[in-house]
Amino acid sequence: MRNPNTETVTMRILARFLLSASDLSHFPAPSVPEIAFLGRSNVGKSSLINTLLGSKLARTSNTPGRTRSINFYEVRRAGQPRPELLFADLPGYGYAKISREISAEWARFVNPYLHQRPSLALCLALIDSNIPPQESDAQLLEFLSAQRRPHAIVATKCDRLSGNRLQQAMRAFGQAYGGVPIVPFSTKTGAGKEELWQQIRAAQSQCPTI
């Protein structure tokens, strides 16, 4: 049975895949606020995007490192004639077998995107709530802070934890990651969906006109 609270956003959202870019020259021209989704390989970025959009636009895979480019999605509310947001699904990181390739890709086009993109309104760092704080995640958050990029943590797969264990995980994340806002999220139950949309809309409203 669907939760009506999670449908209030989904029914108003229309989205489409725009393009996939693995080079700066292929990025779409900045036009609307952009929301970047980042995280370790297999943390659930594509599944989270699909849950937010109420569709299956983003390809999901159990193979870590499948996303090797930045995938852009146009997002608008029903009734609006033009896109209001872009979602950017970035390549994952932190998986040993592909770490060298991913590192090269980050240096070539991901770091420049995060550093230079004028339309980037919010970076969502996805972290698996079922594992302890990781150094690679801490490094990402430090990088975003150094770049003065607005960012928040999305603690994925929270449905796998009991209430007490989830609270413990959130406390551990809060201590490890320096008080960055955290949204517990589940693609299975829809938990956190409304709160995350609130974060996105707030960032959208604060993004300078492009």
State the predicted function of each range:
Residues 2-95:
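Conserved G1/Walker A P-loop phosphate-binding module
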Residues 12-25, 160-210:
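Canonical P-loop GTPase G-domain recognition
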Residues 31-32, 52, 100-103, 138-142, ...:
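Short, glycine/charged-enriched secondary-structure capping and boundary segments
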Residues 73, 156, 196:
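Residue-level signal for inorganic ion chemistry
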Residues 89, 156, 186:
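Active-site glycine-centered loops adjacent to acidic/histidine catalytic or metal-binding residues
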Residues 93-103, 130, 159-162:
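Flexible beta-alpha connector loops of hexameric P-loop NTPases
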Residues 103-107, 190-193:
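Amphipathic alpha-helical transducer elements in NTP-driven molecular machines
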Residues 108-181:
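Conserved C-terminal guanine-recognition region of P-loop GTPase G domains, centered on the G4
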